[in-house]
Amino acid sequence: LILVKQTIHFFNKEQIKSLLYHAKSKLNKSGKLLIFSLKTKNNQIPCFKQMKIKLKKSLKNDELLFRIIKIRLINSKESYFNFKVNITKKKYIEMIKKRYISCLLNMPIKSLSTGINELNSKYKMNIKFTDTLKCISYKKN
């Protein structure tokens, strides 16, 4: 089993091609390759304005990478996993401060603070949403 979880967006096209080539060659006869990433359309992750812009841009890039993956992994299957999330606003804001999602990694502290204020006014004590992961599975023949 080779598992790639929510990291494909850190790679460029050539790196993805190389990763897939090496992963396929290292798989055992009955091995599986699983690639997980955020669902790229209709994502429900609670965002502040600037975070949403960065997330959309990142997910658009993921779409391109998924096309490359589907071409390279012939006969792969695509599925989705839904996770019902119920989190306190306080805990979610702590996660934002720690930049839990990669679109926040290079965001200036001032923008992050503005976004946190936006989330504080937008949400009540609890935040509920469905987090959906896309999974591409490939089995070596």
Cite the ranges covered by each PLM segment.
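Non-membrane alpha-helical structural segments and their capping/turn regions in soluble enzymes
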Residues: 13-17, 113
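Conserved class I S-adenosyl-L-methionine
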Residues: 32-62
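Active-site capping/gating segments
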Residues: 55-77
